[in-house]
Amino acid sequence: MSQGAMRAVVPIIPFLLVLVGVSGVPTNVSSTTQPQLQTTGRPSHEAPNMTQTGTTDSPTAISLTTPDHTPPMPSIGLEEEEEEEGAGDGEHLEGGDGTRDTLPQSPGPAFPLAEDVEKDKPNRPVVPSPDPNNSPARPETSRPKTPPTIIGPLATRPTTRLTSKGRPLVPTPQHTPLFSFLTASPALDTLFVVSTVIHTLSFLCIGAMATHLCGGWSRRGRRTHPSVRYVCLPSERG
């Protein structure tokens, strides 16, 4: 063989060995276990148990239980339960010595019956039910009253406060404004009146000055351009 063929065959040899080893293991196991399964149909108790390595010389033996060798179930005390369930008020149970013992009857109801309540009504004191309408009024907590603040020249109107009943308190203005758009501040009213007078006088002065200037210019025009008078001269008759 050539060197190229040898190089191609050498990597395949380990894979072939692994395949041969894997395929040979299950065949050996099946050959050893097949006679036992054919003879009995199930693993016998007398045959030696196999270990994981496939050898039969294992000193330890595992006991396999079959449905035929199931241990009997312990008997449950059903009779005692039936006797306890059948026991009621006034019923008798058999004791250990063959005698029948009576159970103590259950006590009466925890709550009194309606008949007992009706019988005890005359003996009980009558307690009036509380009326929500006639409940005593709670004392109102007094709030500290602060003195009114001094109203400045540009102060806004005081805020309304709520009474204890939930109604707003209408503040009483200390000063009635001159116009509706003014606030309740006397200093603001004075400032408004003074500014109105100053603006009125300034407009009057401006109007008077404009009239005086316009009248002077008209008079000067007349002096520089006097009016021409036409006079009828007598005709000369020769």
Curated annotation (Swiss-Prot):
Q: What is this entry's stated membrane topology? A: Single-pass type I membrane protein
Principal location listed in the UniProt entry: virion
Q: Which residues form the signal peptide?
A: 1-24
Q: Does the keyword Transmembrane helix apply?
A: yes
State where composition is biased (Acidic residues): 78-88
Q: Where in the cell is it found?
A: Virion membrane
Q: Name one GO biological process term.
A: symbiont-mediated suppression of host chemokine signal transduction pathway
Q: What spans are recorded as compositionally biased (Polar residues)?
A: 28-42, 49-68
Q: Which residues lie on this side of the membrane: Virion surface?
A: 25-189
Q: Which residues are glycosylated?
A: 28, 49
Q: Which GO terms describe its cellular component?
A: membrane; viral envelope; virion membrane
* Alphabetic keyword roster: Glycoprotein, Membrane, Signal, Transmembrane, Transmembrane helix, Viral envelope protein, Virion
Disulfide pairs? Answer: none
Spans annotated as Disordered: 28-171
Per the record, ranges on the Intravirion side are 211-238
Which residues span the membrane?
Answer: 190-210
Q: Where is the composition biased (Basic and acidic residues)?
A: 89-100
What does the function comment of this entry state? Chemokine-binding protein that inhibits neutrophils' chemotaxis.
Q: Please state which protein family the record places this protein in.
A: Belongs to the alphaherpesvirinae glycoprotein G family.
The protein, known as: Envelope glycoprotein G
Native species of this protein?
Human herpesvirus 1 (strain 17)
